[in-house]
From Swiss-Prot:
Pfam family, one: MutS_II
SMART domains (UniProt xref): MUTSac, MUTSd
Gene from which the chain derives: mutS
Official protein name in the record: DNA mismatch repair protein MutS
Gene3D superfamilies: 1.10.1420.10, DNA repair protein MutS, domain I (3.40.1170.10), MutS, connector domain (3.30.420.110), P-loop containing nucleotide triphosphate hydrolases (3.40.50.300)
InterPro entries in the record: DNA_mismatch_repair_MutS, DNA_mismatch_repair_MutS-lik_N, DNA_mismatch_repair_MutS/MSH, DNA_mismatch_repair_MutS_C, DNA_mismatch_repair_MutS_clamp, DNA_mismatch_repair_MutS_core, DNA_mismatch_repair_MutS_N, DNA_mismatch_repair_MutS_sf
Cellular-component GO terms for this entry: cytosol
Length: 863
C-alpha cells in the first residue's frame, strides 16, 4: 500500500475504515460507484471479471468499481463464493459536505447474513448457525437473517449434531475459538455441508448469554423459554454476530425459540439422502425428489413451510389429523382451492420484504410489493369465511389484512416507484400538499425554460439557438459559431466548444434557481416522507410476520390438496398402533417419471405379530422401489398428506431408518462396505420398537460368507432386541429360513413370469421366497453381447449352484509388508459397532496413510 504521508485525505479515510474490517472486501462509496482498492480490488477484479485500473500518482493503488444501483448482483456473486463484504456508504450529501464526505460501514454481508432476494433461493432458507460445546453437550442455534426465524436445540453427540446440520444446510457457521481450531469438526462440516466457517467470540458463561438475549428481546419475550446452557451460548453468538454485522435494530428477528423435537420425527442424513426427500441422484437435483412431487406452492412462505413439514414429520396423531382434515376440506372444495390459488399467485415473499424493511434496505418497489401482497388478504378471508376444519379456521384467524397500512401505502406511493429512493418520483400526487407545490413549481419552471428557447430565438433571430442543461454548468443557451455576431449584449459567455458557444442570462439563471431549488427540495422531502412510511411499516412488522406465517401454512395445505387430487391420493388412517397396512401402494416419484399407467402397485402388511419382511428376488425387479415406497407413504402420512394408495392404515412411526444403495459413493475414500456398516450401526443404536427400518442388500460389500453372516445377525437383532418394523430386501436367499425360526419374520418375493427363456418381472410383491437370481437375464437387459451371455450359461450349468467358480489357474498368494499386516490385524479387531462415524472416519484416514507409506516403500524397492 501507499505510504501514509503520500495518501490523500480520501484514501487515508479508506485506509482507516478498511483497518476495522481486514477480513472483508470493502465496498467504498464514491459518488455513483462502490470502489475497491489494493488487495480488495485485485480479488474483486478476478472474481467479478472487472477491469483493474489504478488511482494516484507515484505509488498508484489498484482499483475497480461497480455502479451502486447494480451492486446487489456483484455483492451476491462475491458472497456466493464465500467472501465477506463491508458496505461503506456516504453519510452526507457530497454537495453539502464541508471538506471530506463522512463515510461509515452500514452493514457487513456474509454468506449467512445476505438478505437480497435476488441472491437467495426463492422458497428456501439461508441459515446462519452457531455451534458450542459446553459440559459435554452440543448447543446449536440457527437464524435466517432474511426472514427473522431464530431457533435453538441441543444435541447429545456429534453424530446428532451433523444430522441436524445436514437438514439445515447453513450457509455459514460461527465457531468459538476452541471449535474453530478443531480440524476434525471442520472436516466433518466440509464433507457434509457447504457452509463457510467464521470464528466468533462466545459469551463468558450461560448467564451472560441469557442476559444478552434478554437485553435485546426483553425479559418477557424469553420468560417462558427454557434455554439450555449450551444452546443459550450458541443463540447469544448468533445475536452478537448479527448486531455486529448488520448495524441496525433487527426489528424483524424473532426471539429464539426451542426447535420442536419431541413432537417431530427426526430424520438422519442417511434417511434423507436415501429416500431422496429434497434432492435426487448423484447430481443432487430437485427433480426426481419427493419435494419435487409435493411442491405446488405459489408463495415463498408456502415453499418454506412445506419443506419444514417434510424435514420434520409429525409424531402426534392429533396434529396429523388436524392437517388431514384441512387437506381434505381443500380436496373436496374445488372452487375454494382454485380461487385461493388465484389470490396467492400475486403474494410476494412477505417474510423477506419485512426483513428488508428492518434492515433499512427496502425501497419504493418493496413497499409497493408489500402493499399489493397484503391487498389480497380481504379476498382470502372472504373465501375462507365458512371453512370448518380446525387448522383452516386457525389460519383464517391469524390472517391480518392490515387495512390501515395498505391504505397508507396506496395513498402515498406511485404505482410504479423508481429503483432509487433518493431521486424523487416516489410519492403520489395528492398525498402531501408541500410535495404537490414543489412538483408544480419544478414542472412550471421547466415549462418556462422550454418557452424561453422560443422567445430567445424570436428576439435574436437565431433559428438554431437552443436551451440545454448539464450537471456541471446547469442551464445554458447554445449558439453555433456562424451566429455569434447576432448574440445580444446581455448574453454572458459560460463555455466555449469547438463549434459553438454557451451563454447564460440573468433571467435564465433566475429560472434555474427556481427550478433546481424546487427539485432539490422536492427530492429531499420525498425521501423524508418515504423514510416515514418505512417507519410505519417497521411498527407493524410482527403483524406482517404473523400473516406471512399463516399464508405459508395455507399455501402448503393447498399444495398437498392439489397433489392429492392430481395424483389420485387417498387419506390414510393414522393412529398410535403398530399396524402398517397399505393397499395398492405406489411410489410417489417413480409413478410420475415412468410412462402413465405402467406403475405396478403393491400391498403391504406389518403388525406386532409379523413385523419383518424378508424380500427376495432378482435385481431390477422392483424390490428397492417397493421398500422405499413404503417408507415414503409412511412419511407422507405423518406430514398430514394424503398418500399414493387405494387405502392405508399407518401406526405412528417415531423414526425411519434406511440403508440402501444410493449412498455407496457418498464418502470420498471410504469403501461401500464401511459406509454400509456405519449406517447399519447407527440403525441398531437408535431404532426403537416404533421405528420403521428399511434395509437394502446389507452385507454385499464383503465376502459372501461374511455378508450373509452379518445380514442374518442384523435381522435377528432387529427381531429379538429392537422389535422394529422392518423391510429387508436381499440377494441372500439363505435368509428365507429365518421365517421358520423367528416368529415375526415373513418371506416375500417379486413375482416372475417364465415362458421358456423369456422372463418377465411382474414387479408384484407376493408371499413366499425365491432362490433364483435371474442374473443372466438382467445382464441381457443391460445389453451384454449374446456371446458373453451364452458363455455365462455354460459356466452356470457346469458348476454347483452355490459354488460357481470361473478361475482355472491357482492364484499366487500375495506377500504382505509388516505395515499391511498391522492394518489388517487392526481392521479385524476394530469394534465398528462401538465407533461413531467420526471415529471410524478418522481411523480409516490413519489406515489409509499407513498403506500409502507402505506402497511408497514397495515402489522404491522395485525401482
Amino acid at each position: 500500500m501507499a505510504r501514509e504521508q503520500a495518501l490523500t485525505p480520501m484514501m487515508a479515510q479508506y485506509r482507516q475504515i478498511k483497518s476495522q474490517y481486514p477480513d472483508c472486501i470493502l465496498f467504498f462509496r464514491l459518488g455513483d460507484f462502490y470502489e475497491m482498492f489494493y488487495e480488495d480490488a485485485e480479488v474483486a477484479a478476478r472474481e467479478l471479471d472487472l477491469v483493474l485500473t489504478t488511482r494516484g500518482g507515484k505509488e498508484a493503488a489498484p482499483m475497480c468499481g461497480v455502479p451502486f444501483h447494480a451492486a446487489d448482483s456483484y455483492l451476491a456473486r462475491l458472497v456466493g463464493k464465500g467472501y465477506k463484504v463491508a458496505i461503506c456508504e456516504q453519510m452526507e450529501d457530497p454537495r453539502q459536505a464541508k471538506g471530506l464526505v463522512r463515510r461509515e460501514v452500514i452493514r457487513v454481508v456474509t454468506p449467512g447474513t445476505i438478505t437480497d432476494e435476488k441472491a437467495l433461493t426463492p422458497g428456501g432458507n439461508n441459515y446462519l448457525a452457531a455451534i458450542v460445546r459446553y459440559n459435554g453437550c452440543w448447543g446449536l442455534a440457527w437464524a435466517d437473517a432474511s426472514t427473522g426465524e431464530f431457533l435453538f436445540t441441543t444435541c447429545p453427540d456429534q453424530e446428532t449434531l451433523v444430522d441436524e446440520l445436514v437438514r439445515l444446510m447453513p450457509s455459514e457457521y460461527l465457531l468459538p475459538g476452541e471449535l474453530a481450531r478443531d480440524t476434525a469438526l471442520k472436516r466433518l462440516l466440509q464433507i457434509y455441508t457447504r457452509g463457510v466457517i467464521t470464528g466468533w467470540q462466545v459469551a463468558s458463561n450461560p448467564e451472560a448469554a441469557r442476559q444478552s438475549l434478554e437485553d435485546h428481546f426483553g425479559h418477557e419475550a424469553l420468560a417462558g423459554v427454557e434455554l439450555p446452557a449450551a444452546a443459550g451460548l450458541a443463540a447469544a453468538m448468533i445475536l452478537s454476530f448479527l448486531v455486529a454485522t448488520q448495524h441496525n435494530s433487527l426489528a424483524h428477528l424473532e426471539a429464539p425459540a426451542a426447535a420442536a423435537t419431541t413432537s417431530r420425527m427426526f430424520l438422519d442424513q442417511a434417511t434423507r439422502r436415501n429416500l431422496e426427500l429434497v434432492t435426487a441422484g448423484r447430481e443432487q437435483k430437485r427433480e426426481g425428489s419427493l419435494l419435487w412431487v409435493l411442491d405446488k406452492t405459489l408463495t415463498a412462505m408456502g415453499a418454506r413451510t412445506l419443506r419444514r413439514w417434510l424435514d420434520q414429520p409429525l409424531v402426534d396423531a392429533g396434529a396429523i389429523k388436524e392437517r388431514q382434515e384441512a387437506v381434505a376440506e381443500l380436496v373436496e372444495g374445488f372452487i375454494l382451492r382454485q380461487e385461493l390459488r388465484e389470490r396467492l399467485q400475486v403474494v410476494r415473499d412477505l417474510e423477506r420484504l419485512a426483513g428488508r424493511v428492518a434492515y433499512g434496505t427496502a425501497g419504493g418497489r418493496e413497499l409497493q410489493a408489500l402493499r399489493g401482497s397484503l391487498a389480497v388478504i380481504p379476498g382470502i378471508l372472504e373465501l375462507m369465511s365458512e371453512v370448518h376444519s380446525r387448522l383452516l379456521a386457525q389460519v383464517r384467524a391469524q390472517l391480518d389484512p392490515l387495512d390501515d397500512l395498505v391504505d397508507l401505502l396506496g395513498r402515498a406511493l406511485v404505482d410504479d416507484p423508481p429503483a432509487s429512493i433518493t431521486e424523487g418520483g416516489i410519492i403520489r400526487t395528492g398525498y402531501n400538499g408541500e410535495v404537490d407545490k414543489l412538483r408544480e413549481a419544478a414542472t412550471h419552471g421547466r415549462d418556462w425554460i422550454a418557452s424561453l428557447e422560443a422567445e430567445e430565438r424570436e428576439r435574436t433571430g437565431i433559428k438554431s439557438l437552443k436551451v440545454g442543461y448539464n450537471r456541471v454548468f446547469g442551464y445554458y443557451i447554445e449558439v453555433t459559431r456562424p451566429n455569434l455576431p447576432q448574440v445580444p449584449a446581455d448574453y454572458e459567455r459560460k463555455q466555449t466548444l469547438a463549434n459553438a458557444e454557451r451563454f447564460v442570462t440573468r433571467r435564465l439563471q433566475e429560472l434555474e434557481r427556481q427550478v433546481l431549488g424546487a427539485e432539490e427540495r422536492l427530492v429531499q422531502l420525498e425521501y423524508e416522507l418515504f423514510q416515514g412510511l418505512r417507519e410505519e411499516v417497521l411498527g407493524v412488522l410482527p403483524r406482517i410476520q404473523a400473516t406471512a406465517r399463516a399464508l405459508g401454512v395455507l399455501d402448503a395445505l393447498i399444495s398437498l390438496a392439489t397433489v392429492a387430487v392430481d395424483n389420485n391420493y387417498t387419506c390414510p388412517r393414522v393412529d398410535d398402533g403398530t399396524v402398517i397396512e397399505i393397499e395398492q401402494g405406489r411410489h410417489p416419484v417413480v409413478e410420475l417419471v415412468g410412462s402413465p399407467g405402467t406403475f405396478v402397485p403393491n400391498d403391504t402388511y406389518l403388525d406386532q405379530e409379523q413385523y419383518i419382511q424378508i424380500i427376495t428376488g432378482p435385481n431390477m425387479a422392483g424390490k428397492s422401489t417397493y421398500i422405499r415406497q413404503v417408507a415414503l407413504i409412511v412419511l407422507l402420512a405423518q406430514i398430514g398428506s394424503f398418500v399414493p394408495a387405494r387405502r392405508a392404515h399407518i401406526g405412528l412411526v417415531d423414526r425411519i431408518f434406511t440403508r440402501v444403495g444410493a449412498a455407496d459413493d457418498i464418502f470420498a475414500g471410504q469403501s461401500t462396505f464401511m459406509v454400509e456398516m456405519q449406517e447399519v450401526a447407527g440403525i441398531l443404536k437408535h431404532a426403537t420398537r416404533r421405528s420403521l427400518v428399511i434395509l437394502d442388500e446389507v452385507g454385499r460389500g464383503t465376502s459372501t460368507a461374511d455378508g450373509l453372516s452379518i445380514a442374518r445377525a442384523v435381522t435377528e437383532y432387529i427381531h429379538n432386541v429392537i422389535g422394529a418394523r422392518c423391510l429387508f430386501a436381499t440377494h441372500y436367499h439363505e435368509l428365507v429360513s429365518l421365517a421358520e425360526e423367528l416368529s415375526g419374520v415373513r418371506n416375500y418375493c417379486v413375482a416372475v413370469l417364465e415362458e421358456g427363456e423369456d422372463i418377465t418381472f411382474l414387479r408384484t410383491i407376493v408371499p413366499g421366497s425365491t432362490d433364483k437370481s435371474y442374473g443372466i437375464h438382467v445382464a441381457r437387459l443391460a445389453g451384454l453381447p449374446e456371446q458373453v451371455l451364452e458363455r455365462a450359461r455354460e459356466i452356470l450349468e457346469q458348476q454347483p449352484r452355490a459354488q460357481v467358480r470361473v478361475l482355472t489357474k491357482p492364484v499366487k498368494k500375495p506377500t504382505l509388508t509388516p505395515g499391511e499386516v498391522q492394518v489388517l490385524e487392526e481392521l479385524a479387531g476394530y469394534n465398528l459397532m462401538a465407533a461413531t462415524p467420526l471415529e471410524a472416519m478418522e481411523q480409516i484416514f490413519r489406515w489409509q496413510k499407513m498403506l500409502h507409506k507402505e506402497l511408497d516403500i514397495v515402489k522404491r524397492s522395485r525401482g
